[in-house]
Amino acid sequence: MLNRPSSPDGGEAHAWPPDPEIPVFANAEHAHRRPLRWMFALVAVALSCLLATGIWRSRAAPPHAATQTVAPAGQALPPGRMFTVHPREPEPAPLPDMPAAPNPILPQPRPAPPVPPPPIRAPYDYDEPAPRRDSAALKSGPAMMVATAARLGQTERAGMAEDGVSADAATLIGRSVSRATRSGGRDYRLLPGTFIDCILQTRIVTNVPGLTTCIVSRDVYSASGKRVLVPRGTTVVGEYRADLAQGSQRIYVAWSRLFMPSGLTIELASPAVDGTGAAGLPGVVDDKFAQRFGGALLLSVLGDATSYMLARATDARHGVNVNLTAAGTMNSLAASALNNTINIPPTLYKNHGDQIGILVARPLDFSILRGTNE
């Protein structure tokens, strides 16, 4: 680009002839770019001045000067906590090893002297025969049988502990040694636990207590098995009670005496069992449901029916009082009837001809038969 010569006062000295080789629009473009170049030059000079000023200030400031900013009085922080460093104390000298004290020797307690066990006695002495009773003591009759059965029942009830263990079992629990004994005269003894088959001769109805009999259906041999002590056909007499509890299915029968065909009589005092040896005799039980609850149910139904009919036949204003009075009366009658009949005991029926059993509860001595042909 060619500059035009100018005069000293800034004006053009003379007209510059345009160059015929440069087009007119190129001269116009250069004329428009000229202000931009001046602007860029001014910006570069300003930046250079700013940079030089910053370098001069950084060199003029002290090299290690610290700037401290003072906070306002309301925002000043409290002074920090001061710690004091104490010198380390010297470690104490180690203690010398001391021997351990020996354990004291305590005197040993002396063992207690052994206590000899108490002498054990057999519940039944088989070596000595039972003492004979005179004929007056062996009189038969309802009084003797009732007394024997009552004594047997009291003995069984009193001999049971609270936990259901019999008195004999409770006595034997504390015994540590059992000694065997030899029973003499086994040919004329029946041992406890002997089973006697019997056929019931009388019907049993437990509404009232009473007596019953049975006939021995099979010969019963002695403990040795050599002699028949209770022959077939022997009559056994016993007694039953009437206090059958609700829900019970068995009746207790106590057999008191044996009457042999030869005329010999012996006190038995043993309970009745069924064919399997279970205590008591089973039978047909009538729980009397109709007698216990029939009256109360009937009165309750009548009360409901009366209330229903009164509610239909009475007007709405007075029917409520009459209905409540009638219903309350019927309910009271039903409760009174139930209280009077709820405790009716059930009845057990045991037919005659049933096969039952007798379990001997104590040893029976038949030494009176010694020397006879029986």
Swiss-Prot record:
Pfam families xref list: TrbI
Compositional bias (Pro residues): 92-116
Disordered: annotated span: 87-116
Keywords, alphabetical: Cell membrane, Membrane, Transmembrane, Transmembrane helix
Residue stretches in coiled coil: none
Chain ranges passing through the membrane: 38-56
GO CC term (a single one): plasma membrane
UniProt-listed InterPro entries: T4SS_VirB10/PtlG, T4SS_VirB10/TraB/TrbI, T4SS_VirB10/TrbI
Membrane topology reported for the UniProt record: Single-pass membrane protein
Gene3D superfamilies membership: Type IV secretion system, VirB10/TraB/TrbI
Localization (cell): Cell membrane
Chief location bin: membrane
Protein family membership: Belongs to the TrbI/VirB10 family.
Classification via NCBIfam families: T4SS_VirB10 (NF038091)
Protein name, as recorded: Type IV secretion system protein PtlG homolog
Gene: ptlG
